[in-house]
Amino acid sequence: MDKLIKSIAKSGSFRAYVLDSTETVRTAQEEHQSLSSSTVALGRTLIANQILAANQKGDSKVTVKVIGDSSFGHIISVADTKGNVKGYIQNAGVDVKKTASGEVIVGPFMGNGQFVVITDYGTGNPYTSSTPLVSGEIGEDLAYYLTESEQTPSAVGLNVLLDEKDKVKVAGGFMLQVLPEASEEEITRYEKRIQEMPAISTLLESEDHIEALLKAIYGEEDYKVLVEEDLQFTCDCSRQRFEAALMTLSKSDLKEMKEEDHGAEIVCQFCGKKYQFKESDLEEMINDKA
């Protein structure tokens, strides 16, 4: 199972999250039948969302909306504090040739737009904040969001590597954050280490990429693992939820659906599961509105 490890430098000056999200992104690709570029863009967004949700407590949920004006359209992801995440990309069919180094192109097909984060604390008043997309590569956009919106200087690396058949080979990433206790000397040292760090794709290719990520972040400095959490792609859609959505329609709309379409089919955007509602189901809803 995928996992996220939270750690902190022994000095208390920095904290880091490292993630193995391979199965999460693999499941998303299978559910949406997404092609190469779309898979990488969606995968990076899911990983970013897993990081943001891991920052929360209780039963909070975090929604990430990467709203671009290019080929991908919008990417929407929702994660909770229990390691569950789901998401979809408007255009799952973007398949652009890789660069000479084998990297899948993402940024230009995200375009200009916003990185939006909605945090629902379960109180009925979700908090929304956003920053402009700085590159469309998702990792850089998350780092900018954390630094500008949450006022926490952060370094982020996210990626999804595909095999020769464009199936998910490995996915994961890291987030490193400066804590108030950090001295200027420590900040300079960590900045240098991050600048000299191997590419995230190289680290993910390592046999034990979780350990490789931790080693790249902390070097020879001591750190403490705080907690290890399981991660998974899970959709919480249900027939009851979509039935409730249908019940928000007017009586005339339900009648029109029953008489013209002889039923209704609703497809969950997050996982592709289909829910069928027969004429008799719609009739029952109409009667309930009487």
Curated annotation (Swiss-Prot):
Q: What coarse category fits the chief subcellular location reported for this protein?
A: cytoplasm
> How is the protein modified post-translationally, according to the record?
Under oxidizing conditions two disulfide bonds are formed involving the reactive cysteines. Under reducing conditions zinc is bound to the reactive cysteines and the protein is inactive.
Record keywords = Chaperone, Cytoplasm, Disulfide bond, Redox-active center, Zinc
Q: Record keywords: Disulfide bond included?
A: yes
Q: Where in the cell is it found?
A: Cytoplasm
| Gene Ontology CC annotations of this record | cytoplasm
The record's Gene Ontology biological-process terms are:
protein refolding
Q: Which GO terms describe its molecular function?
A: protein folding chaperone; unfolded protein binding
Provide the function of this protein. Answer: Redox regulated molecular chaperone. Protects both thermally unfolding and oxidatively damaged proteins from irreversible aggregation. Plays an important role in the bacterial defense system toward oxidative stress.
> What family classification does the UniProt entry report for this protein?
Belongs to the HSP33 family.
Against NCBIfam families, the record matches this protein to:
PRK00114.1
Name by which UniProt lists this protein: 33 kDa chaperonin
| Species, as recorded | Streptococcus mutans serotype c (strain ATCC 700610 / UA159)
Q: Which gene encodes it?
A: hslO
